[in-house]
């Protein structure tokens, strides 16, 4: 199997981002976005997806968290696209439901090359530790659009910290499952012959 790794940079007037990704990693991460709670979520994503991940972001946090969260998701999505290349041998589909105390999140993913996003539920508080709660939903949408994922997510609970963390863990576990190589498959998991 070839290395499924990527290194992607994104520089705009709003953010300067460097991301490295190893899909077949051990869950090691080095994250610095300037938003402590977002760093915690990306670290959790790396840990539970067993992705080796580095994210360095210098964003316009003097304005708000929107550009930082969105642009990290865009860059991470591009990294997944690069690392998975032609997607040969991947399982493609996966779903996971993850609890965290009273909260539960679900993610259903298809690494289809056809970006589509649905979200069910609301976050219980407006923000957590410097991150606006609705940006967790926007992160998933931006990741979906830039990694070519059909992604259906949902959350339920009473504590936004728990809801968002369960969401990131569920996303990680789903992507870990969907990106795994099925040794029985030598081609792409599509009747079209490509994804």
Curated annotation (Swiss-Prot):
Its EC number is 4.2.1.19. One of its GO terms (biological process) is L-histidine biosynthetic process. It comes from Haloarcula marismortui (strain ATCC 43049 / DSM 3752 / JCM 8966 / VKM B-1809) (Halobacterium marismortui). Transmembrane segments: none annotated. Keywords: Amino-acid biosynthesis, Cytoplasm, Histidine biosynthesis, Lyase. GO terms for molecular function: imidazoleglycerol-phosphate dehydratase activity. Belongs to the imidazoleglycerol-phosphate dehydratase family. The lineage of its organism: Archaea, Methanobacteriati, Methanobacteriota, Stenosarchaea group, Halobacteria. This is Imidazoleglycerol-phosphate dehydratase. Pathway: Amino-acid biosynthesis; L-histidine biosynthesis; L-histidine from 5-phospho-alpha-D-ribose 1-diphosphate: step 6/9.
